[in-house]
Every structure is written in structure tokens, then in C-alpha cells.
Curated annotation (Swiss-Prot):
Protein's GO biological process: translation
Protein name stated in the entry: Small ribosomal subunit protein uS7
A single MF term (Gene Ontology): tRNA binding
UniProt-listed NCBIfam families: rpsG_bact
Gene name per UniProt: rpsG
Source organism of the structure: Ehrlichia ruminantium (strain Gardel)
Length: 160
């Protein structure tokens, strides 16, 4: 067992424009090299474009896109008797949110590499795709679900 103390969770201050902790976490995921102002411009610009395209408020688009991408199940490796099994487990709320934020960011980054568009446009497109239950981030979630479903037979090896 570890002799260290359990790490304290950092308190994240809400973002300045929408006063949302989830959006502040998303800005932290997008941020590179401590450039918060650039990350805020990208996220706020993408949200305003999404708001203009759909006609709903930016926060409702963001929260529903996030809820559509958040996974409920994932697989974890468990070694039993010299054999490694992929055991499906439920995902805790905090991990589910952080996975969804990372997947949306990663899907927008890969779209940015494939096209000649700005990152803000790719992020807007990815948020709208996640809102409509399509796109790269939603595809990653569905792959995780398929893995969990395929390994359902090993669910009795749950972690304690």
C-alpha cells in the first residue's frame, strides 16, 4: 500500500464569461503552454459560432454535447492467473467528464490536422457533431461501449 497521503482535489474557479466550472475545465484542457487567454478566445469563439448556427444558448449546446460524449462504462485490464482480462467497469462522474472533455479536444485537433481550417472552427464543428450524437468524440465513446459489451462475460472479475 502507498504511504503517501491522498492528493487533494484542486478547486477550479469558474470561467469569467459563463460562470461555469465545466467550461473552465474545458479551457484548461484546450490550453497549451499556459496561454489561457488564447484558449479562452478559441473556446468562446467556438461556442458563439455554435450558438449562431443552432439558435440555442451556448451553455446548453456545450452541456448537451458533453452529456452525449460522457461514457458510462469502460474496460480496465485485470490480471488473473497469468491471463489479462478486459473487465468492464462503471466510470465515475468526474472521470467521465474529464474523458469527454479530452475526447472532444482530441477530435477537434485531428480534424484540424486533416483540414486547413482554424482550430476554433474545428472545435465548433466537433461540439455540434457531439450535440447531434455524431463525430469523432462520440465515435470514441461508442468504441468504448462496444469493448465493454464484448467483454461482458468478464464482468464478474470486478475491481474491489
Amino acid at each position: 500500500m502507498s504511504r503517501r497521503r491522498r492528493a487533494n482535489k484542486r478547486v477550479i474557479t469558474p470561467d469569467s464569461k459563463y460562470n461555469s466550472v465545466l467550461l473552465a475545465r474545458f479551457i484548461n484542457v484546450i490550453m497549451r503552454s499556459g496561454e489561457r487567454s488564447i484558449a479562452e478566445k478559441i473556446v468562446y469563439g467556438a461556442l458563439s459560432k455554435a450558438e449562431n448556427r443552432i439558435g440555442e444558448s451556448a451553455m446548453s449546446v456545450f452541456s448537451s454535447a458533453l452529456n452525449n460524449v460522457m461514457p458510462q462504462m469502460e474496460v480496465r485490464s485485470r490480471r488473473i492467473g497469468g491471463v489479462t482480462y478486459q473487465v468492464p467497469v462503471e466510470v465515475k462522474e468526474d472521470r467521465s467528464v474529464s474523458l469527454a472533455l479530452r475526447w472532444i479536444s482530441r477530435a477537434a485537433a485531428t480534424a484540424r490536422k486533416r483540414s486547413n481550417k482554424m482550430y476554433m472552427d474545428c472545435l465548433c464543428n466537433e461540439l455540434l457533431e457531439a450535440y447531434n450524437k455524431r463525430g469523432g468524440a462520440y465515435k470514441i465513446r461508442e468504441e468504448k461501449y462496444k469493448m465493454a459489451e464484448a467483454n461482458k462475460a468478464f464482468s464478474h472479475f470486478r475491481f474491489n
